[in-house]
């Protein structure tokens, strides 16, 4: 079945996730669902029908990276993106594109360059009170964790959750002397202030002072969290949050990257 419009592709999305793909392809497709990105549906369904399974799997991984940079972090126009995807889908359907190498040059316009991606991500905040955003943050941190330690965490596992290092509801101002009102809303929801922690540890440390929290971080099995105890054990402040955000973004630039599309 060929989809002739993005609207049809959106309507076809349950089959897109549940029946078309399996294994790693299904995992990548579900990541697009997590991103709430629908613009590449028509392209992916055309590619699944016409390209080799190997080329399709490669394309799907590339689309996930493009979507993370373009849609999730930079939040750029979906209309422009949709037009490009639809043009490529038509070329695949008409037989003008028959393999991934012919397709790649057409995706370059949608691949956000490292500097723009980095600069935007450095200033990004994530309101983790929103359930979908919270899940997105878990995806980002678990992906970075896998790259750092090799631990592949199940995204929906109840055994761990998101820890706000500077708490959402800090108890005493004396426990967090580096934070003033101007910083609170910004600092709390920056990725640099968020980390992974077991559900048990997170519950037990609650809104404790950083001097108490860091002792728990030091024993944590997650590298992304142990890093805090190893590098920022003296204090926690807005400046340090920015420093850690810089570290996490640097990792992200390497992880969500397509070398064939990167231009020097």
Q: For each of these PLM feature ranges, what is it?
A:
Residues 52, 158-161, 264:
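N-terminal low-hydrophobic presequence detector
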Residues 45, 60, 64, 163-166, ...:
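Generic hydrophobic alpha-helical scaffold/packing signal
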Residues 92-228, 235-237, 255:
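Betabetaalpha-Me/HNH-type nuclease active-site subdomain
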Residues 1-138:
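A cross-family structural signal marking well-folded subdomains
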Residues 54-63, 68-72, 76-83, 109-115, ...:
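C-terminal, well-folded lobe of enzymatic/effector domains
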């Amino acid at each position: 079945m060929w989809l002739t419009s993005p609207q049809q592709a959106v309507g076809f999305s349950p089959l897109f996730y549940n029946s078309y793909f399996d294994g790693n392809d299904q995992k990548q497709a579900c990541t697009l669902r997590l991103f709430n990105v629908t613009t590449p549906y028509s392209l992916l369904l055309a590619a699944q029908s016409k390209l080799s399974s190997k080329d399709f799997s490669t394309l799907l991984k590339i689309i996930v990276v493009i979507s993370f940079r373009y849609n999730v972090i930079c939040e750029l126009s979906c209309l422009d993106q949709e037009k490009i995807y639809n043009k490529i889908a038509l070329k695949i359907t008409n037989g003008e594109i028959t393999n991934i190498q012919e397709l790649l040059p057409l995706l370059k316009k949608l691949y956000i360059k490292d500097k723009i991606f980095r600069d935007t991500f450095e200033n990004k905040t994530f309101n983790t009170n929103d359930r979908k955003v919270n899940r997105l943050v878990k995806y980002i941190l678990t992906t970075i964790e896998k790259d750092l330690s090799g631990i592949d965490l199940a995204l929906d596992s109840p055994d761990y959750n998101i820890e706000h290092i500077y708490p959402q509801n800090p108890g005493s101002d004396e426990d967090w002397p580096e934070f003033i009102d101007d910083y609170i809303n910004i600092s709390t929801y920056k990725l640099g202030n968020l980390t992974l922690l077991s559900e048990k540890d997170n519950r037990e440390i609650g809104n404790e002072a950083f001097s108490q929290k860091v002792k728990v971080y030091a024993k944590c099995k997650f590298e992304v969290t142990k890093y805090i105890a190893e590098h920022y054990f003296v204090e926690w402040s807005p400046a340090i949050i920015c420093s850690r955000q810089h570290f996490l973004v640097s990792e992200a630039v390497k992880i969500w990257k397509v070398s064939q599309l990167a231009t020097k």
